[in-house]
């Protein structure tokens, strides 16, 4: 069963994260937090099919996977995620595969979410956006982002020392009008 193997894999990720301490924060959100976020972001969308979820800082992919527990059609979830760290990107891809997610329902990218918007093709707005971005990380906040559709309507950029705020704006940009976003912030 894919879920049993996938759950075992997530358990091992959690054990590794516990042993890695603070450094693990870049790829792991505790299961209790992940479940609460999934339950909240699925409220009112339980019957939606297909359901598109996006995590622009996907880490291990657990935030996206947990949404299935709260949807009537869990096999119609499409997963869209991006991760900067290549090793962590591969960890997430393996996590989704071990949970039985078909490659047709996986749209993952290894890249810098804030530096270059992704995804830029359909679908680029989602039923749910979930994320646990790196806390108070730095980002370029270059003037070119003032004309970036994700940020331009605000007329001002997140400070260079507050990438978490830029992630929040990125999430709003990719959220459907009827969608729900869950984000872990300091």
Give the label of every model feature segment.
Residues 23-131, 136-145, 151-154, 185-186:
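Conserved S-adenosyl-L-methionine
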Residues 5, 9, 137-138, 142-143, ...:
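Short, flexible segments with low predicted structural confidence
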Residues 18-22:
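Conserved adenine-nucleotide phosphate-binding loops and their immediately adjacent elements
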Residues 2-6, 23-31, 161:
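Conserved phosphate/pyrophosphate-binding and hydrolysis machinery centered on Walker-type P-loop NTPases
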Residues 1-17:
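Long recognition/docking surfaces used for binding and targeting
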Residues 37, 157-186:
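Conserved Class I SAM-dependent methyltransferase catalytic core
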């Amino acid at each position: 069963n894919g879920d049993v193997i996938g759950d075992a894999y997530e358990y091992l990720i959690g054990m590794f994260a516990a042993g890695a301490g603070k450094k693990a924060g870049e790829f792991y959100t505790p299961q209790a937090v992940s479940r609460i976020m999934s339950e909240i972001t699925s409220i009112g969308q339980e019957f939606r099919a297909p359901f598109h979820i996006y995590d622009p800082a996907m880490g291990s992919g657990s935030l996206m996977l947990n949404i299935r527990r709260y949807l009537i059609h869990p096999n119609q979830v499409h997963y869209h995620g991006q991760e900067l760290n290549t090793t962590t990107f591969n960890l997430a891809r393996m996590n989704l595969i071990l949970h039985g997610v078909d490659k047709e329902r996986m749209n993952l990218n290894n890249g810098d979410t804030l530096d270059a918007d992704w995804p830029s093709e359909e679908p680029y707005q989602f039923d749910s956006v979930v994320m646990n971005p790196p806390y108070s990380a730095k980002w370029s906040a270059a003037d070119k982002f003032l004309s970036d559709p994700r940020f331009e309507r605000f007329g001002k950029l997140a400070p260079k020392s507050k990438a978490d705020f830029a992630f929040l704006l990125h999430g709003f940009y990719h959220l459907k009008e009827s969608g729900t976003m869950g984000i872990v912030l300091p």
